[in-house]
Amino acid sequence: MLVTAGAVGIPGVLIGPLESEFGWSNAEISAAFAVRLLLFGMMGPFAAAFMNRFGLRPVILLSQTLIGAGIFGALWMTELWQLTLLMGVVVGLGTGLTAMVLGATVATRWFVNRRGLVIGLLTASTATGQLVFLPVMAALTEAVGWRAALSVSLVALFVAAIAALMLMRNRPSDLGLAPYGEMAVVPAPPQQSLLAMLASPIVTLRDAAGTRMFWLLFGTFFICGMSTNGLIQTHFIPLCGDFGLAAVTAAGVLAVIGLFDFAGTVGSGWLSDRFDNRWLLFWYYGLRGLSLIWLPFSDFSLY
C-alpha cells in the first residue's frame, strides 16, 4: 500500500517536466492523469471481488505488475496518447486493484477487536508513501531527470512485490490462527463462481444506489477525492511553481501534509472505535473545507 501510494502521488512531480520536454499543456497532462483517478475509483468494488475469489497475494502481485508495466513503458513515451494509456489506463487499473480496499479487507479478515485502529494504520500507509516518495521523486527529477526518478519507483515496486510474494497470507485460517479478538479459527467462505464474482459488485451497487445513505456517502467521498487526489496531489506542486516555490520545496510541503495525514488517519481509526462516525466526518470535512477556502488568499510562502 505504501509503494502504491507513492505511485499515486507521482503525477504532481511529473507535470512540470512533461510540459517542458514535450510541450504538452497542463490541461492535456491532467486529462491523462484524470483517467488514472477514474479507474482508481471504479476498480474498488471489483478489486474486493477479486480478492475474495483469487486471494490477496495474486491480486497484489497483479496490481504491482500493472503499475510497473505502466511506469516502465512511460520511460519511452513520446506521444500524449501513450501517457494516457500507460500512466492513465494501465497505472489506474493497477493502483485501483489495491489502494481503496486492501486495508479494509485485511483488517476485516484478521481483526475483530481494534478493527478501526488497524484500518486507520493501514490507510495511513498512503500518507507515509506520500511522505517518503514525493520529496525523493522531486529531488531526483530536479537532479537527474524524471526518467531516473521513475526508475527508482520501479525498484521500489519490485521490492514490494517480492515482499508480498514471500509474506502475504490470505486469511488467518491459512496459518491455523483465529482473527484477533476471536477465540475460534474462522474458515474461509465458499468461493463464488467466476460469473457470480463479476456480477456481485454490480448487484451490490444497484441495491445500494436505491438508498439515501449511499448517495450521501458517495457525494462526500467524491468531494474528498476531488480535493485530495484531484487537487492537492496532482496540482499542488505545479501551483507552487507558479508562485515561485521550487518543486523540491513544494514536495516537502506535501510531505508535511503526509506527516499530519498519517497522524490524523491513525487517530481517526482510534476515534472511530469510540465515537459516532457521522460527527467525525462532519469535523473532518469542515476543517478541510476551511483550509481550502483560505489557501487562495495565502501568500504561498514556505511558512
Each language-model region and where it sits:
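Cytoplasmic membrane-interface "Motif A"-like loop-to-helix N-cap segments
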Residues: 52-64, 274-285
